[in-house]
Amino acid sequence: ASIEILPVMESAAKIRAAVRARLDPNLIIVARTDALTEADAIERAKIYVEAGADLIQPISRCFTSIDGLRRLRQGCGVPLSLQLLGWLENDLTTEQIQEVAGLAVYPLVGLFTVTETLKQNYAQLWKSKSVHGLPQPMINMADSKKMIGFSEVEALQSMFLLGNLPKK
């Protein structure tokens, strides 16, 4: 299967547009390499940095070692943004991540943690037909509501659904 990659100059133009439109100086612009070879990824990254990208995100199977990430980091001159999956998650040390990355995200840790917890608790619930003795703890309703800011929803419900609109 062939992979369609956006032309580098079109990508650079989009980065320049994002830089120009940036209102918050703390907004970080991350550019993806989307390249088939390491050399192409480095060349694309250089162009993206010149266009104003703050971080480079190597979305490419051509990087298979820390040495390749080091070459990208050195070649483009800015820190990398890493999505820590697969070998990145398993093989890189914290020190290596800090060496090359300005931003590192573990995008599936939460999902996989919740999935395993659900699997364990639902298996026990199916077996025992009771929530007592579940292998993983559950949050209580009050803490859950507090965590998601449900009091704001309840205030809006009170205001609009019950007709308690503020006087103008």
Model-identified regions with their sequence ranges:
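Substrate-binding cleft of secreted/luminal carbohydrate-active enzymes
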Residues: 111-114, 151
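Histidine-centered beta-alpha loop that forms part of the nucleotide-sugar donor binding/catalytic region
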Residues: 85
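Flexible C-terminal active-site loop/helix
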Residues: 125-168
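Alpha/beta enzyme core
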Residues: 1-82, 90-106, 112-113, 119, ...
